[in-house]
Amino acid sequence: MPISPKLRALISSAWDDGSPCLLATAGPNGPNISPKGSMIVYDDEHLAYWERSKRQALENLGHDLRVAVIYANFKAQRDGVLESGFLRFYGTAALHESGPLREAIFAKLLPREQTHAGADKGIGVLIRIERAADVRGKPLP
């Protein structure tokens, strides 16, 4: 599933633009939604983020690796950059506590994420995208 340079740039700058990606997980105690400021497009088949907080989202991933990621940016919609203003990604996460994939994810993060307190103890999370669409169900632009 090709992800355009435009979408890559929007997602990479989501936190700085005030439109962070939200990660939805579910576990034995119910669902959880967490902002993930480190979310990036890893490649055309994956999103990735750096798990530093190690709280409810990580606990839920220990029970169920299925996730949803939503990106909402009303300014991009108003400016005509992103028609619906919303993107949804559904997929399966894989946790990388060590090894080459952890290091590869870390290398792709923005500098503010690489130097953030606790970054050295973070976990790389790679999300295989199984389907993605805008909020109206249209394919990614």
Question: Which residues does each predicted region cover?
Answer:
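Binding-site signature for planar aromatic cofactors or substrates
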Residues: 1-141
